[in-house]
Amino acid sequence: MKSAAYLAALAAVLPAYVNAQAQEWGQCGGIGWTGATTCVSGTVCTVLNPYYSQCLPGTATTAPPPPPPPPTSVSSSSSSSTSSAPPSGPSGTSPTCSVASTIPGFSNAALPNPFVFNDGSPVQSKADFTCRQQQILALIQGYEAGALPGPPQSVTASFSKSGSTGTLSITVTDNGKSISFAPTISIPSGTPPANGWPLVIAFEGGSIPIPAGIAKLTYSNSDMAQQTDTSSRGKGLFYNLYGSGATASAMTAWAWGVSRIIDALEKTPSAQINTQRIAVTGCSRDGKGALMAGALEPRIALTIPQESGSGGDTCWRLSKAESDQGHQVQTATEIVTENVWFSTNFNNYVNNLNVLPYDHHMLMALVAPRALVSFENTDYTWLSPMSAWGCVNAAHTVFSALGVADHHGFAQVGGHAHCAWPDSLTPSLNAFFNRFLLDQNVDTNVFTTNNQFGGATWTQSSWINWSTPTLS
């Protein structure tokens, strides 16, 4: 009888214990978190940043993570090619457009005007704005991203396929050094379109659903530039090529890697990829990287950052204002102590954001007139939901000025775990895929928020003090 009573009591307790554990992909810790701090079997509570720990598939280990694999040599396969002068990936600067990496004496507490040149003169045409984008590109590199190298001396690529999985083997050589990496491509079934399959380059595999008829390349961006913590500075394939002292941040190095992938695809027709229809995506820290890649690489047709938060589709000034209103958000001062996503030079400005002659609305402006759709999650205050809404509104003025407002989308909802995809957003996502990768005539007017900012307030007139011009 005692045994029966004991088992009955245990049976009553166990469900409560299980329920007290966070489920797979659920939150299990972080600043201000008061919920479950242990995870269900088969998952481990993983610290993503000081504000958020998540139950990820796997088992706990006390051993440090293994170092990235060494570069692999390119094997012979059905197709290979070498380019001694691969096409330029990141856009350069025109000799007729005056650019500078910094603007001494600049100060503006509001969001800087994207429609004036560095000297204060107005942008009056689309051609003018192309020059303005070159100025913005130089400023972002000068203040926070670090220097983006130009095209390397050579890119060698080969492609092999086994079933529905392809392997793109890439070797990049510059200044007498070489690196190699080999991303895999999930290839749709059936006959490819005449120009090849559209492609999504997914940072660390991505988190969004990809429609049928679109290939997916899994980009191990953390091999290109490590991002464990601040000790990762200067580590990864990119730095093996350009040196550990290169000023490029991890995100800039990731963008450089995306450009080399596109170089390789352009030189490898057997991969049957349409290099005019490429998207890039990632979530959280990798969402920040996807946005940076879309901004720096003009061959990307569609950029899809997911829950990129501070350092992504939010603005530094707005995140600070959100923090000043008493909300626990990631700010510039905190993020530079967390990881190596930005150059060390950015540390000089995080305590005086007013001197930045740009903010991240202008990072997003580098994507225009190409397509950009971003998604945010208001359930997580540290993602700076008010800052995201304000920042994308400021960026939207650029797309509107260029006559392509429907090339820029945004949706901000809650009700799901960080980086878990809510089905309610799939129609908006698919609209952008259908239009910009699958060439369908569909409506992409998507720009919405649930206005759940945790009490933080967005007042547009306090931050956007310019009128949107019509550029021709």
From Swiss-Prot:
Extent of motif GXSYXG catalytic site motif: 282-287
Any one biological process term the GO annotation gives: carbohydrate metabolic process
Signal peptide interval: 1-20
Field pH dependence: Optimum pH is 5.0-6.0.
EC number: 3.1.1.117
Pro residues composition bias: residue spans: 63-72
Domain CBM1: 21-56
Active site: S284, H418
Record note on temperature dependence: Optimum temperature is 45-55 degrees Celsius.
GO-annotated cellular components: extracellular region
Compositionally biased tracts (Low complexity): 73-96
Superkingdom of the organism of origin: Eukaryota
UniProt KW Glycoprotein keyword: yes
Protein keywords: Disulfide bond, Glycoprotein, Hydrolase, Lignin degradation, Secreted, Serine esterase, Signal
Subcellular localization, as worded in the UniProt entry: Secreted
Catalyzed reactions per annotation: a 4-O-methyl-alpha-D-glucuronosyl ester derivative + H2O = 4-O-methyl-alpha-D-glucuronate derivative + an alcohol + H(+)
Region entry Disordered, spans: 62-97
UniProt cross-references to Gene3D superfamilies, sorted A to Z: alpha/beta hydrolase (3.40.50.1820)
Main location: secreted
Keyword Glycoprotein: yes
Family: Belongs to the carbohydrate esterase 15 (CE15) family.
Protein name: 4-O-methyl-glucuronoyl methylesterase 1
